[in-house]
């Protein structure tokens, strides 16, 4: 009887794990079926158009705009990977490290590179697997532990022990984890449109609306098919994400120009360029929830109210995981791509946060 009591907790844990993974893969199958129907519909309308992809051999001129900074590379010790980044501002100034989301790369921070270089060494990174940064082949190389170690090693390689850390979307997830695991490395934390990781995992299990909005997390668990679907019709999905009325950048004057959009398509149309970014998501269900989750770094959370991928209620709940100073600002009529959609307002809010004194909660 005593042995049975000892085994019962392990048995319950095993059953919960089996149930969880059964639900994950069932939803993966459902998402894959929906995308397969989309593919068949596209083929029915015109197979030639579905598989059309013009060659893009040369990067658009905007990617070499000198006003954005200097293209640099650093090889880090732990993994041996070479990382690409664009840096603006003088060496020796305090470091501001910018982590992009999906499907983005360093260029999504173009407004911030210009804005903050007067007082900071601003570094906009291509994350592991993105852009000109090395992309390991195996999905195991994209676990959250690896991504966290990347940022720690990059700081060391750049000669800094701490930074102002800003992350958007998936980069926001990594920024939260850095602040949790290495609080001494983060002077101030700024996250754009991504809640605390524990809030995200708890909320998605209880709210079907967020489960639907995050369906791509599940679709990305499937090998090769997501990359294929992302690239058909000359990257129609990518264009839709940034330009459509439902998901795109809506503010007039900040919408992506033809050249901006071509820059995104150029980067993700390179051979194998989609597998690295999607591999980030292929490990997420084995890494969450977190064992340690409290944030002690002064934190600013910025949120676009019209985010098509994240429920705004998650932003409000995030404050329970921040022990120290926490400020939340929700911008009305702003999309998920907040730092590109409302750059003037976002930059002003960041400046205010950086310059104000942040005291611990009583």
UniProtKB/Swiss-Prot annotation:
Pfam families: Abhydrolase_1 (PF00561). It is a single-pass type II membrane protein. Its EC number is 3.3.-.-. The active site is at residues 169, 281, 336. It is an enzyme of class 3 (hydrolase). It is found in: Membrane. The keyword Amino-acid biosynthesis does not apply. InterPro entries: AB_hydrolase_1, AB_hydrolase_fold, Epox_hydrolase-like. Keywords: Hydrolase, Membrane, Signal-anchor, Transmembrane, Transmembrane helix. The keyword Transmembrane applies. Residues 94-211 form the AB hydrolase-1 domain. Its main location: membrane. GO terms for cellular component: membrane. PANTHER family: EPOXIDE HYDROLASE. Belongs to the AB hydrolase superfamily. Epoxide hydrolase family. This is Epoxide hydrolase 4. It comes from Homo sapiens. The lineage of its organism: Eukaryota, Metazoa, Chordata, Craniata, Vertebrata.
